[in-house]
UniProtKB/Swiss-Prot annotation:
Organism: Solanum lycopersicum
Locations listed in the record: Secreted, Cell wall
Residue pairs linked by disulfide bridges in the UniProt entry: C414-C434
Protein name per its UniProtKB record: Pectinesterase/pectinesterase inhibitor U1
Gene: PMEU1
Purpose: Acts in the modification of cell walls via demethylesterification of cell wall pectin.
Amino acid sequence: MTRVEDFFSKQIDFCKRKKKIYLAIVASVLLVAAVIGVVAGVKSHSKNSDDHADIMAISSSAHAIVKSACSNTLHPELCYSAIVNVSDFSKKVTSQKDVIELSLNITVKAVRRNYYAVKELIKTRKGLTPREKVALHDCLETMDETLDELHTAVEDLELYPNKKSLKEHVEDLKTLISSAITNQETCLDGFSHDEADKKVRKVLLKGQKHVEKMCSNALAMICNMTDTDIANEMKLSAPANNRKLVEDNGEWPEWLSAGDRRLLQSSTVTPDVVVAADGSGDYKTVSEAVRKAPEKSSKRYVIRIKAGVYRENVDVPKKKTNIMFMGDGKSNTIITASRNVQDGSTTFHSATVVRVAGKVLARDITFQNTAGASKHQAVALCVGSDLSAFYRCDMLAYQDTLYVHSNRQFFVQCLVAGTVDFIFGNGAAVFQDCDIHARRPGSGQKNMVTAQGRTDPNQNTGIVIQKCRIGATSDLRPVQKSFPTYLGRPWKEYSRTVIMQSSITDVIQPAGWHEWNGNFALDTLFYGEYANTGAGAPTSGRVKWKGHKVITSSTEAQAYTPGRFIAGGSWLSSTGFPFSLGL
């Protein structure tokens, strides 16, 4: 019994010892686990803290970049809030270029919203007048143009500054966004004819102005970024221009295609198609020839328009690029129509010929609107085509003859005749060696040669009249004292017009320029005159506005030559038309 008791007693002692050891081991394990947990927790907390610090640093840096980029815009609060309200914007912004790109993408969405709002308005608003319906369709067209321009600008920015020369990048980007701003104004301008129009305008105003401000901000940031980059480039390298111009040494530019070189070298251009009203060509109307022309053509497509009077409205849509209209002489080939505001059109839609597609050329043709002075706005030619040029063409109408709507344009050896605001719009347009004649207007009217429509100080737009002849037609000359004629008036706030090296007859009033409405734009416009001659050229009696300037420096005047103002050195040779790049 004792052994048994001893045995069990030992067994019990052994079990107790084993249990103690087991508990000790468990305790040790738990202690180690606890320590590991604490260490891991500390490390995790440290990592999370580091990650949070990194995120905060990135966010802070992105905010600083956005603030800096937006500080030079006209609407900095809108610029900043639009960007920082984008989800994860801090991950998308590492440079000023990123801010611009993001801003443009936001603007694209805003334009789309406006587009669908207009479509809905057309469907649902009762009692729209015929002109209001036309104006709303004008809005859809200009919004569509804006979307294309913004998308192209984004693509250009993604490759900036490596796709092409820095200067070309700069001019292209400024032109695209300047045109986008103009399009918003054009939409609203269609609703400015009567009180009913203005009610519809009020519905569209907020959305259109929002897009315009967003585009304005993008343009300001582009100007700031590119000005800095150009300054840096000039420090690093001496100015050089490897592109040789025909004007300089008789050689063709290296970027001109072989096909276009052959076309320009030929004394007689072989057309791709012929338009003849008498049925002797491929088509009877110009419109039909345009419809059948290839889209997005990379080579020149020549449409010869034989002698005749073509009574039609012609629209060259944006996809019909590189079209050239070649007439049989401006006295022989005439395209004419008579749409006008008085009969229910908008100014934009009244044009006999409208050109939107890029690189459209015309020579030896008359564009005419025969509506007459009593019908008010009636456009003969509306040009929104970038890198477009006109040679030996006549533009004949009364009020609003030539609408230089948007983009870069060049007119050489042309005649423009009209009455009120007969060269108007917001393109970057240069007239060289042209005749610009005021006609006899309606009773009580004054003639205004120009009405330039720049709305933003950063737009690269304006009207330049260089080496031209400004005078009067035969019907005005005998009665010109009864109908005062002026060089221009400010259609929009930052209106810009320069008259230089031109002959001006006494048809122009000594004051030279006329106000639009009281003091509107007199301080913000820029009206320059340089080295003009003739009885109407003296500047001593000119208006004393802050925005008027007599230019005395040839260096300053150079800024308004084709080579500088419309980057003519990179494209005018490809037209085959005569031109001078400088003074």
